[in-house]
Amino acid sequence: MSKEKDELKNLITFSTFILSLNTAALVHLGELPDPVTNKKQVNLTLAKHTIDTLEMLKEKTKGNLTFEEEKLLQSILYELKLKYVKLID
C-alpha cells in the first residue's frame, strides 16, 4: 500500500465513522449548518433515519466494540434522541 492509503486507513475507524453520522444527524436536526448551503435546516425524516442507523449499528456490533467505542455510541445516541424528541414535541 502507498503511504497515502496507509494514512487514510489509520484515519478511518469505527469512532470516526460514528462521529460522521453524528455530524450528519446534527445537520438534519438543525444544530449545524448544511455544509453545502451553509444554512441551518431541520429535516426530521433524515434525522430519524440517521439515528435509526446508529441504533442498528449499536445492535449489530454489540459485544464487538471497545469500551470507548461503546460509550461514544451510547452517548451520541442519547444526545441525538433528546434533541429529536424536543423537536417533534
Predicted features and spans:
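N-terminal intrinsically disordered, cationic/polar leader segments
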Residues: 1-52, 56, 67-89
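Acidic, glycine-enriched active-site microenvironments
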Residues: 61
